[in-house]
Structures are given as C-alpha cells and as structure tokens.
C-alpha cells in the first residue's frame, strides 16, 4: 500500500474484532511515528501500551453517553448545525469507554514539554505539541497500511490526573490523546464524511 492508498484507507472506527494486535505490528507502527518531523530533533516521545482488560479497566475513567437526549443537548450547546458533523458525535458519544476498552491495541503517547501546555508564552511554545501530532498521524497511516483502523480521544483534565497516577509518567510529560487501534468489526459503523475538494481550499498569493 503506497502513502496515498494509506491516506484514503485511514478512517475512524469505534467497533473492533475481539483480536489483539501483535507486538511486532505495534512496533512497526510506533517506528513509523518516530519518523515524523520533530521540532527539536530529539523525538522526546514515549509510548505506554495497555492491552490487558484488567489494566484498561483500572486506567480508564471514561463513560459512554447512552442518553440520546443528553447527546442532542450537548450538540445544541456546542452550536453544531451541520448534520454530518452531528452524526459523527452521535456515533462517538455512546462508545467513549467501549472503543478504548475493546480495542485490539491501546496506546498512550507522551511528549516532553518545556513549559505548561495550556499556558504557552508564544506560538513557538506549542512546537512540542504540534510534533507529537505529526507522530500520531504517521502512526494512524501506518496502522491503515497494516489493515488496522481506530480512533483518538483527547482526555479530560480529571482523566489526565488519574493517568498520571496509574501510569506513573514524569511531570514534564503530557499525554495528548488515547490511540485505539484494531481490526474493524464486521459490522463496524463508518460515519459519512463531508466531501471536500482541495481546489476549494487553495488560495494563490492572497486569500
């Protein structure tokens, strides 16, 4: 699979086969992540793999949103009016816990920070944050080339505090998201994407 095929194949799914991802495959995916550009050339990234169900149960402080009315109220509160966008959230919210607990591989990526992430002194202060997301995108594309799909989820503040205790990571490292990767279930739902043309997004010389 070439890079363009992997880009087309990469999709977000939240329903997985009951099948673990082999460590050799995980290492290849992380190695692809480590090939991403990095702001300081040091690639100060670390990865915690959590594949045991008991360990995941102890780690995760996430709940599925099972109430459709609650979900609709949340979307209204966000001011979402696009139906494709709303459908994405309707798909996601009831699976917030299950997509992480039942995945074939749960990866917790970490990156080293120089100053508090939510109190940057300048745009350049976010270079570390930008670099780890380049790494994560490489990993998602590598996973797609392996026949794996998945989802990322950004933790809430209370989740991050619990993860710090559960995993024991250093104070100067931050987890930007959970990465759940696995083999798609046969009935895995794949929400429709908005069709967007590159030509409509390109501006020559001026906006």
Language-model segment annotations:
Residues 6-12, 174-207:
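C-terminal helix-cap and adjacent tail motif
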Residues 13-28:
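A short N-terminal beta-strand-loop micro-motif at the entrance of redox/enzyme domains
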Residues 28, 33, 105-109, 113-165:
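Small-aliphatic-rich amphipathic alpha-helix that forms the alpha element of a beta-alpha
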Residues 31-35, 90-95, 163-166, 188:
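Glycine-rich, charged/polar anion/phosphate-binding loops
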Residues 37-42:
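Glycine-rich phosphate/pyrophosphate-binding beta-alpha loops
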Residues 44-45, 103-106, 175-176:
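Short, surface-exposed beta-edge/turn micro-motifs
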Residues 49-131:
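Glycine/small-residue-rich phosphate/adenosyl-binding loop
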Residues 161-175:
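Short, electropositive alpha-helical surface patch
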